[in-house]
Amino acid sequence: VLFPPTRSERKTPATLSTGFRPPTLVLLPLLRESLEEYAEREAIKALSGAGTREAFADWLDCPPSLRRSKLLALARRRWERKLQAARRRLEAPAATWPEVCHQVAMEILGYRRNRVPMANLAQRHPLAEVADEGGDVEALYEEEAASWKLGAVRPQNHPRARLAQYLRLVEKRPDWPARLAASEPFPAEKENQLRKALKLSELKRFLAEDVLASQVGGTRFDTLVADGFLPLLAARSGKDLFSHWRHWYPGDAPPQLKTFLKEIELIAPDGPEPCSNGLLQGGLQHFIERESP
């Protein structure tokens, strides 16, 4: 029988009412990704599949306004999942804001392929240690030498490069999680506010320069904000930051997702709004649900 352990069973073996302790095979330590990440991976595979074209027809049968509302409903579900995950991390025993931020940032800088080894390093080497003692890129890299996935990794995304990038950030901004907390944006008064009304360009500049010391840029910066910073800030404050997350700038995403949004006529050079994180996330959620049994 496969079942998730209760909170008490995580420390003590399962025991039946008769007192018998059945043999237990613990698989959780062997899970290299979260179930959500497995689902994302399968959805991304489906984006290149033969069945993707058929999905376009289903969407094009709807009027444009309904297509948009359907996609945003999917994006909202994805946001709620990220928010729930952020809450769990912040509410975990002994969790602190600086350490959760430290772990999340390192995981996201590891990209999908090297998220787990980066998470392992973040847990073994707390932010306070890295800030006080610095860090040696080669020593950190060797700690997870057997775990790195290097096939088809671009030089700028190599784990050594991302470790060096994060160490530079901590050297320049050892208090970066506190600075992030100070950046907490105000919730939108209306869910349909656009980037200008939400002052996202000012927030982006503050996060890039004051919080991250200009050490993380490009689409990985936007992914760090959308997947890490905004859910954590919302979980910490209790404010609804969905509009900020929904209108945030596109981060790293499979090119097939943009193709999907173009095919269902939700983004175009002369369209009503630019491509955004929320539209991409809604598209990804569509394929996750489509591939789920």
Model segments located where?
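Cysteine-cluster motifs in flexible loop/terminal segments that predominantly coordinate metals
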Residues: G283-S292
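Internal, well-ordered alpha/beta segment that forms a basic, Gly-enriched binding/recognition surface
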Residues: L2-N120
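Hydrophobic/aromatic-rich, well-ordered segments within soluble, folded domains that form packed cores
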Residues: V1-F3, E291-S292
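Hydrophobic, aromatic-lined core segments that form the binding pocket/scaffold
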Residues: K70-G283
